[in-house]
Amino acid sequence: MLIKLKSKIHILQNIYLKNKYFLKKKSYAMDGEDLAINRHTNNIKNGFYVDIGAHHPVHRSNTCLLYQSGWRGINIDINEFSLDLFNYLRPDDINIQRAVSNYNGEIEFYFQKDFSQLNTTDLYWAKENFNNNFQTKKVKCQTINDLLDETKYKNKKINF
């Protein structure tokens, strides 16, 4: 447990110091999607976003640029470590560890590494892409409507 905590602290320090999170970049998304989002929402000040499968608050993030522009929102990801990063780097957002589904309950989660964008709840996809080399665990799942209703943003218009 102590080793896991030290590892998380070390990674968080590296993200802050090496990536200089607070120095703005032109784009954080993988292929500039955040720039397109910014163009389409440019006239909206203090907007609200919901990022399902958020994964990382900076690296390949479609919402980091919005956050830096004053928007706030909800970041949802299955991975506990992802949420630790969001809580550290985006404290003004609501960050929720959950799978989004068409029902409330539990769902199987298939993964090779604890922290990967390739982890999935789709067994067929996991078998095909992980060559049957993956682990499984049950995680909480919830409908997006029920999840949003539990936050301070209930009934708020989603801008992105």
Model regions: which residues?
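Phosphate/nucleotide-binding beta-alpha loop and adjacent structural elements of enzyme active sites
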Residues: M1-F160
